[in-house]
Amino acid sequence: MPVIRFCDGSQQVYKHSVSLREIIENKKPNIIRSLIAISVNNSFSNFNTLITEDSSISFISKKDCEALNIIRYSCIQLLNYAAKKTWPSCKIGESEITKSGFYCDIDFENSITEEDFFILENNMKTLIKREYFISHQNISFDHAYEMFKKKSEIYKIHLIKKYINKKNKISLYYHENYFDIDMGMQVFNIKFCKYFKLQKIGGIYWKGDHKNKMLQRIYGTAWSTKKELDKHLSYINELKKRDHRKIGKLLNLYHMQKESPGMIFWHNNGWIIFNELEIFVREKLKEYKYKEVKTPLLIDKSIWQKSGHWDNYQDAIFTTSSENREYCIKPMNCPGHVQIFNCGLKSYRDLPIRMAEFGSCHRNESSGSLHGLMRIRNFTQDDAHIFCTQEQLRYEINNCIKMIYDLYSTFNFKKILVKFSTRPKKRIGDESVWDQAEKDLSDVLIENNLKFEHQEGEGAFYGPKIEFVLQDSLDRNWQCGTIQLDFYLPIRLRSFYIDEHNHQKIPIIIHRAILGSIERFIGILIEEFSGKLPTWLSPIQVVILSITDSHINYVKKIVQHFSDINIRVESDLRNEKIGFKIREHTLRQIPYILICGEKEIKSKKISVRTRNGYNLGIIDIDCFIKKLQKEIFTRSFYQMEE
């Protein structure tokens, strides 16, 4: 007499063995159509499973929160199955679900391209039309090993040998005659996987090691309904339109090339944006009483060994040598700032010392992880380190928070998420020091009325931290700002100051970043504004168009006037239709398009249009300049008449 317990807490007693189909028809007949998976005692089951003993049963429909992961795990095996049917010699590597879909790593004899997606997708759809049932089996380690060995699945053999105990059973899912290791529960019938789309392909070294073979990673997305899939694809299309790599090329901002992977070739337009951001941050540094410094690009390896960076980050550090000495190309600025602090005796009266740098840093990121401006090997940190006493700590944290929000407000980000990371299991320092540091950080956040997410155990081994995450208009999160306490580095690099009792004391270091990486922040801004940067950041702020050749001299005169007062201006004197010119410069995202014809010359005025299509009419030149200068000077987010 099996007792069946359901996930809603109810239970039912059956006088004899009973199939899952009977249980469903008795208990929840209305969910059969939407049912995608059934779990018996936390294991996969199907309609025909016979229950002979007391069991716990969960019915999973499309509406349940775990449904998406179940569909996506099923799509992973479906993709691998279709790949094996299409290219029988391919070898299946690792696969995983993602936030919006899944990916599969596959070793093909000959590389496939995105054009092959059409073939692969069609084969997946053909398999779905069969509406085959997915089955599940637990077998011995040795049996599974022999099965994968017979198929020459070298990557699967590696995975089971490394991650599965030989004494344990191995769980396999079967899609018809194709089997694979159980990564997560799957649907009981493949028909529930029809709302999917293959999206892109990339390269990935096996196990992330460049010494291993390069596999191809296929990314896909999968959803419960067509509506959800269409919504996601629409979102992806919007992302493609905003892609900073595409817009960067269109606006002639920068380029990258294979001879210098992960490095930026800034063109004049892009370098203007870079410099304007640097000028803006530099003004704030002065306002908040920071001292700007510059540290060397090459520093002897011994400094990085003393600081602990070599032990923890050496794989990411580029090195070079000269005259039998080994140097590190700096991956971060902090050890260099400590060297400046250590130069000369410091008194408690000298503290706090707020030291800032636009530091050019290099990190040896894997080639597969590089992505436009967002993930590069050479980047500029708007980095600062504050050397202070325990008594000054709260004020300095508060000052950092104020500065961070001051800068972010200029860019009109609607939502800033705050995360507070506390002590990890592996850490240095006394518990009392950690207690006080965490209290200082959390108290300052509370005093500033900032809601924050606790990230238990996510702090660095040398101190707790606060992260500031920008949420853009597409609800993507970008971690930019950080406030990180450090009790460790000043000890390792022997930093001290003389206190009021003439004793040596170790300062606390606050690591502070706001933009994070200037290059990455530019990428974020380009995508947030779809290339329509605020006027103060726009490489060209005004373009002046002539209608005919007879208007050229008037245009040149105005261009010279604008240039003399430091407005970034261009002219377009080509003998083209005015509508064509307007469209072209609108696509270039130039904030203001000025038109000069007979009417404008006679009135000694200009016709003004914005890149958003607003016609501001004929305006007095000095009046326009006054408004434009105010917009630029105040770093306004909005254009005239908006």
Curated annotation (Swiss-Prot):
Instruction: Tell me the GO molecular function terms.
Output: ATP binding; metal ion binding; threonine-tRNA ligase activity; tRNA binding
Record's Gene Ontology CC terms? cytosol
EC top class named in words: ligase
Q: What is its EC number?
A: 6.1.1.3
Extract the InterPro entries matched here: aa-tRNA-synt_IIb (IPR002314), aa-tRNA-synth_II (IPR006195), aa-tRNA-synth_II/BPL/LPL (IPR045864), Anticodon-bd (IPR004154), Anticodon-bd_dom_sf (IPR036621), Beta-grasp_dom_sf (IPR012675), TGS (IPR004095), Thr-tRNA-ligase_IIa (IPR002320)
UniProt keyword annotations, A-Z: Aminoacyl-tRNA synthetase, ATP-binding, Cytoplasm, Ligase, Metal-binding, Nucleotide-binding, Protein biosynthesis, RNA-binding, tRNA-binding, Zinc
Q: Which domain of life is it from?
A: Bacteria
Q: Pfam families of this UniProt entry?
A: HGTP_anticodon (PF03129), tRNA-synt_2b (PF00587), tRNA_SAD (PF07973)
- Stretches the record annotates as Catalytic: 243-534
User: Where along the chain is Zn(2+) bound?
Assistant: 334, 385, 511
Q: Which PROSITE patterns match?
A: AA_TRNA_LIGASE_II, TGS
**Catalytic reaction list:** tRNA(Thr) + L-threonine + ATP = L-threonyl-tRNA(Thr) + AMP + diphosphate + H(+)
Cite the Gene3D superfamilies for this sequence. 3.10.20.30, 3.30.54.20, Anticodon-binding domain (3.40.50.800), Bira Bifunctional Protein, Domain 2 (3.30.930.10), Threonyl-trna Synthetase, Chain A, domain 2 (3.30.980.10)
User: Where in the cell?
Assistant: Cytoplasm
Q: How is the cofactor bound?
A: Binds 1 zinc ion per subunit.
Q: Which cofactor does it need?
A: Zn(2+)
Q: Which residues form the TGS domain?
A: 1-61
The biological process GO terms on file are: threonyl-tRNA aminoacylation
The role this protein plays is:
Catalyzes the attachment of threonine to tRNA(Thr) in a two-step reaction: L-threonine is first activated by ATP to form Thr-AMP and then transferred to the acceptor end of tRNA(Thr). Also edits incorrectly charged L-seryl-tRNA(Thr).
Provide the family line. Belongs to the class-II aminoacyl-tRNA synthetase family.
What NCBIfam families does the database record attribute to this sequence? thrS
Subunit comment? Homodimer.
The protein, known as: Threonine--tRNA ligase
Q: Give the organism, scientific name.
A: Buchnera aphidicola subsp. Schizaphis graminum (strain Sg)
